[in-house]
Regions:
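N-terminal Rossmann-like FAD-binding beta1-loop-alpha1 element of flavoenzymes
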Residues: 75-103
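Mid-domain catalytic core of redox enzymes
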Residues: 346, 350-485, 489
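Active-site/ligand-binding neighborhood in enzyme catalytic cores
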Residues: 219-357, 364-370
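Conserved flavin/dinucleotide-binding core of flavoenzymes
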Residues: 24-65, 119, 436, 442-614
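Glycine-rich FAD pyrophosphate-binding loop
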Residues: 93-119
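N-terminal export signals
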Residues: 1-23
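Glycine-rich active-site loop/strand segments that organize a redox cofactor
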Residues: 28-42, 112-144, 224, 231, ...
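Dinucleotide-binding Rossmann-like beta1-alpha1 core, especially the glycine-rich loop
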Residues: 123-213
């Protein structure tokens, strides 16, 4: 439980596991009005946060944009308070000194970008969840820059095992939920793992052909491309989808392929959009007998905080605006620390201005002249479109740490080729719902810690990893409130991947919170109702984190033409423009926290070069 106190631990020092697990006895004493993580209902890119952004996209700010000058002049303005933007501000401050004046502007009511903190209250206690970015985890090692930043913030991923209490999940295993619309009956079947394939598929509501096909795929090592050399097999697998491989070469029935309908590969590639080669690298079934080699990823260390990577964002804000927490925080103490949002935009070296949508960034001088020292004008207004009042500040540098797609409409003077490149990616829509259950009895009765639901509204259910850190305890117990996470990545099967992202985004924006809540309650009732679950009594909190513009777009061998690295859209799009630089995950074509941090460091270096400092 979260007690909302700041523990007296020295900065930059992680406590021992024994210290981290020590209990506390007070409750979070904030309200949703003053503490955004407590706001429930529809969050993420919620109504009121994006209307002006859509107006900019639709050309409302195509001409000159008038605004009242606030008289403020900053060394740096950062557009976007996600991890990349916050990291850029800290890197810039280190380079220019503690007196550098920095303003961070964001259109949401909370900082962190996709790394949002969810806090749900029940009976005087508060329970944490993550609203987007889940963990420190990548299929490749963190760079020196990203690793050094984590260490400076007091985060040591190699210590995670000290806080992880896997014994609390003993007896719980993955399960699959089959829905009656697609499989004939609602049934939750545990035992979804390789040690149990025979009994698992025997207990599943599948016809004989589907069951036989899935058993063959999961248990037999068959070379489905016997007439090709290993190199030719690899080449072919790069050019076909996993669905095509299953249909054409593994001869799976339609029922067997339906089993994979909700399977999400990296960055939400689905069975019909994921290259078969990538599915093989992700250990999808069907490739054990193919004798095709592939690179083994050198994965980074893993660390999961109860609020996901919102902890990183909170530690960054604590460094930039020390009064936010009042005292220095460690990676452990910050888990329960209360931040004072009223202090974010007070006079000081760094200010964070939330609920403000930037609609224009423009040079007042000539961006093509290296020695032009005229400032950049930044205009912003309320993001919901209820007021036409706009304000302008001046900055010696600007870092665009928002989505690539919106930048051409905010910085219309960019070269046309660069604007086209920035418009190229189609961000992946995602929806993370944090659901607080009155207790964990239903999960224990069915013996599951995660559920795959191939054709349901939410395709994944996860019980959070059990950790003890900073006095906060995650324990999926039958006798205490339990946080679960539901994942949905809206898509439109049968279309190219980018089009699926666009159609999924439209669907998400069209749905209201009551509609999402009804689908959530219906699905959980159908999953757990036979185990005594009653959604009206047992669901005691719900926060839906809707991200129509979610994960950064990544290239694949089906939907993107090969081209030299220097010509790829994300590289062309991120080029500095006078005193303006770009830092975000989009600029790395990778949906990872560490690449967002790397982009921040690059953008700061480009800013310093633009001012003749390096």
């Amino acid at each position: 439980m979260i007690q909302g106190v700041i523990l007296p631990i020295m900065a930059n020092a992680m406590p021992s596991p024994a210290q981290a697990a020590s209990p506390a006895a007070v409750s979070l004493n904030e309200t949703a009005a003053s503490y955004p993580p407590l706001r429930t209902g529809l969050r993420g890119q919620y109504p009121g946060s994006f209307e002006v952004a859509h107006a900019a996209r639709d050309g409302l700010f195509a001409g000159p944009v008038t605004a009242t000058d606030t008289g403020e002049h900053y060394d740096l303005v950062v557009v976007g308070a996600g991890i990349s933007g916050l990291s850029a501000a800290l890197f810039y401050q280190r380079a220019m000194g503690p007196d550098a004046r920095i303003l961070i502007v964001d259109n949401h009511d909370d900082f962190g970008g996709h790394a949002k903190r969810n806090a749900l209250q029940y009976k005087g206690q508060t329970y944490l969840g993550y609203g987007g970015t889940m963990s420190i985890e990548t299929p490749f090692p963190y760079s020196f820059t990203a690793t050094a930043l984590l260490l400076d913030l007091g985060i040591r991923p190699d210590t995670y095992s000290s806080y992880l209490k896997t014994s609390r999940l003993k007896g719980l295993e993955p399960a699959v939920f089959y829905d009656r619309e697609n499989f004939g009956k609602d049934q939750l079947v545990p035992g979804y793992h390789e040690k149990n394939w025979d009994s698992f598929f025997r207990d599943s509501p599948l016809d004989d052909e589907t069951r036989t096909d899935l058993l063959r795929l999961h248990t037999q090592a068959i070379n489905y491309l016997p007439d090709l050399t290993p190199d030719a097999r690899q080449a072919l697998l790069r050019t076909i989808s996993y669905e095509t491989f299953l249909q054409r070469y593994a001869h799976m029935s339609d029922g067997a392929i339906r089993f994979f309908a909700g399977k999400a590969f990296r960055n939400n590639m689905r069975v019909d959009t994921c290259p078969a080669y990538d599915a093989m690298k992700a250990d999808a079934p069907g490739f054990n007998g193919m004798e095709v080699t592939h690179d083994t990823p050198h994965e980074s260390a893993v660390f999961h905080f109860p609020d996901g990577n919102a902890t990183i964002a909170r530690l960054l804000v604590g460094r930039l605006v020390p009064s936010f927490f009042g005292t220095p925080q460690t990676a452990a103490s910050v888990v329960m620390a209360q931040g004072n949002y009223s202090r974010l935009d007070q006079p000081g070296a760094v200010r964070i201005r939330l609920n403000s949508m930037v609609v224009r960034v423009e040079h007042t001088g000539d961006p093509t002249k290296p020695n032009d020292n005229k400032p950049v004008r930044v205009v912003y207004q309320k993001p919901d479109g209820t007021s036409d009042t706009r304000h302008a500040v001046m900055a010696d540098n600007v870092i665009m740490a928002c989505f690539n797609n919106i930048i051409p409409f905010i910085v219309p003077s960019l070269p046309e080729a660069q604007k086209d490149a920035l418009k190229y990616p189609s961000k992946v829509p995602m929806q993370y719902s944090s659901v607080l259950l009155r207790n964990g009895q239903a999960l224990r009765r069915c013996g599951t810690q995660s559920i795959y639901a191939p054709c349901s509204y939410h395709t994944r259910l996860l019980v959070d990893e059990p950790v003890d850190i900073g006095g906060y305890t995650t324990n999926p117990s039958p006798d205490r409130p339990t946080m679960i996470h539901l994942l949905r990545n809206a898509n439109a099967p049968g279309h190219p991947r980018k089009e699926q992202n666009r159609l999924g985004r439209q669907e998400m924006l069209a749905m209201t919170f009551p509609e999402i809540e009804a689908k959530t309650r219906d699905q959980l009732q159908r999953m757990f109702g036979p185990l005594g679950f009653n959604h009206e009594q047992d669901i005691v909190g719900l926060t839906v984190n809707r991200w129509p513009h979610g994960y950064a777009y990544t290239y694949d061998t089906l939907g993107d033409a090969y081209m030299p690295a220097a010509l790829r859209p994300h590289v062309v799009g991120r080029q500095p423009y006078g005193r303006i630089a770009i830092a975000n995950a989009d600029s790395t074509a990778a949906a990872f926290t560490n690449t967002a941090i790397d982009a921040a460091e690059r953008a700061v270096q480009e800013c310093l070069i633009s001012r003749g400092y390096t």
